[in-house]
Amino acid sequence: KKSLALDFKSKEGFEILTKLIKKSDVVIDNFKPGFWDKVGLTNEWFNKNTKKIVRNSISGYGDVRPQGGLPGYDFLLQAESGLMKITGEKDGNPMKLGVAIVDIVTGMNAVISVLAALLLKRKVTDQSILTEVNLYNTGIFLLANVASNNLISGKEAKKYGNGHPNIVPYNLFKTKNGDIAISVGNDNQFKIFSNLIGFPNWAKNNRFKTNENRVINRIELEDLIQNALSTNDANYWYQVFLNERIPCAIVRSVSEALCHEQTLKNDMVKDIPHPKGKKFKSVNTPITINKKRGLDVPLSPPLLGEHSYEILTKRLSMSDKQFLAHCKNGVIRDGRYKK
């Protein structure tokens, strides 16, 4: 990611912007709907001047009323989409997720739409392609199986804490020294699980024999499991279940997760150079291509306008004299760090 700071409300800045667009393959924006039309860069302009371009616009709600055109915020969209109503303990207040999940997935959807459009561009060559994503649609999309259950059954979704509406046991349980997550996905797994914790008769009991009945008798069964697991520590049960391929995980803190051997072996923590000469640690990309992850020398989040000079002199062949004049007039900000 590189930063160009440009005042394109000015005549000179607008001219620079249009030149950059014409030399681009993809243009992504997060302006309010209608912004491009307002500044004169309509769909007709893009189709006439930039037939090779794929565009992507990210907004809060799209351009359809009643809320189209309003700004969007992750916290508010978690509330409006229903996500808060299905997050938290059964009798607790609506709760947001621990990360800005709507923001994050909207960005991922933007990337997916751009990649799909680039493939389509092989066939559609006579006009630019516009893709659009918004936070509201992403929030609704994230309801996933909860939305399906509601649409098919007509029943209002409930909060299950760490549980699952359709699978039991699927929850956190306390051990002697910490919490462990258990996800028993079918009746055969439950038979093995019951035997491992010392209660093989559970799998023969009609109240627990099938997942359907385990869901009905959820509270009773979870209490029994809790009593059994509290007799030993988390790592003990983790090894017992892991050896028999029962899905489970020890609940870690963020610090524990970032320092875990698997995280480090997967190269998920990276030293990033800072523009001011220092280094800081950050999470690496989760994607590998041909076993290679990310850049050899990853870029830090840029200073504002840090790459203005690089972009304009290389992409537009702007002279140093022109660049300095635009900086003096406030059209461009030169954010290069000067030691």
Predicted region positions:
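Active-site-adjacent "lid/gating" segments in soluble enzymes
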Residues: 23, 35-180, 184-185, 192
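Flexible, small-/acidic-enriched active-site or ligand-binding loops
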Residues: 274-325
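A structured beta-alpha segment of the ubiquitous adenosine-cofactor-binding alpha/beta core
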Residues: 2-48, 230
